[in-house]
């Protein structure tokens, strides 16, 4: 008896799964029921001569550092090395509307009833339903089945806005900074909160890249994970840097960012002493970085993500460059990233090609 064909999953031909890695991707076996019909973009970090083994049956393309250098040329300098921030190269070369990115130490979680959670499906539902950043709904996501807008919610805002980002959570190993890891080495996250909420306009959040989905067409050019890792004075701030940038831009352009479901199972705790070395400067710098982003505003001329990001890069150079020369280098890399994005995506815009030569140079 012939087996029935597998049902086509949501957005099968409109979504890429991006995975940064330095090891064989055996973890994909657990995700096979949910990922097998999607296209994978694997960004190999570290030694490009190492062969990364991918389980049979997956449709994928794999890029190592040699590929990144070949494709981007001198602009490859904006892509981090020996850091999971390299994943953003996968965002750049994707041709799909949506991206889901996951770390290779993350596995399928189970809900309180024992059922395996299809994290990707929940992310897609989050992205395809509107967000409510301008007025908080006390029943959280009003578009989920079994809920609605509460009494007193303005009818003029009930249509919502497009969702740009879906930020998922994790069970087991929490995403803590090194000092918290050191004082709570045995703590595990066992709380499953069945909720999705929109992060209000004007509020920042610490974005984690291990279980993250976004609309690439809406916010992709701003989803840059910065300069981290090899040769840089800081690490483990890549996803948070991107999160602060995209939140300022989403607030300006009128897009929404959701957090909550879905959960994944985070299996491996990283070394807190290694993490402390990576985070040390960032722990101090963030006390100035956060107020910078809280106060950041973009001009009315910023009508595209690229324009927003270029303007934000100039503010980074001007206001954070006084903290450390690293931020001047980072601001330049932000411009390089946008230029590379537009070149790769055949969308070379006038504002990105002219800015580096004139406006940004004038701020040096």
From Swiss-Prot:
The conserved DXD motif is involved in enzyme activity. One of its GO terms (cellular component) is cytosol. Reversibly glycosylated by UDP-glucose, UDP-xylose and UDP-galactose, but not UDP-mannose. Belongs to the RGP family. The lineage of its organism: Eukaryota, Viridiplantae, Streptophyta, Embryophyta, Tracheophyta. It is found in: Secreted, Cell wall; Cell junction, Plasmodesma; Golgi apparatus. GO terms for molecular function: UDP-arabinopyranose mutase activity. Probable UDP-L-arabinose mutase involved in the biosynthesis of cell wall non-cellulosic polysaccharides. Was initially shown to possess an autoglycosylating activity which is dependent on the presence of UDP-glucose and manganese. InterPro entries: Nucleotide-diphossugar_trans, RGP, RGP_fam. The keyword DNA damage does not apply. PANTHER family: ALPHA-1,4-GLUCAN-PROTEIN SYNTHASE, UDP-ARABINOSE MUTASE. The record marks 151, 158 as: Required for activity. A motif (DXD motif) lies at residues 103-105. This is Probable UDP-arabinopyranose mutase 1. GO terms for biological process: cell wall organization; cellulose biosynthetic process; plant-type cell wall organization or biogenesis; protein glycosylation; UDP-L-arabinose metabolic process. Inhibited by inhibitor protein (IP) which may be a form of sucrose synthase.
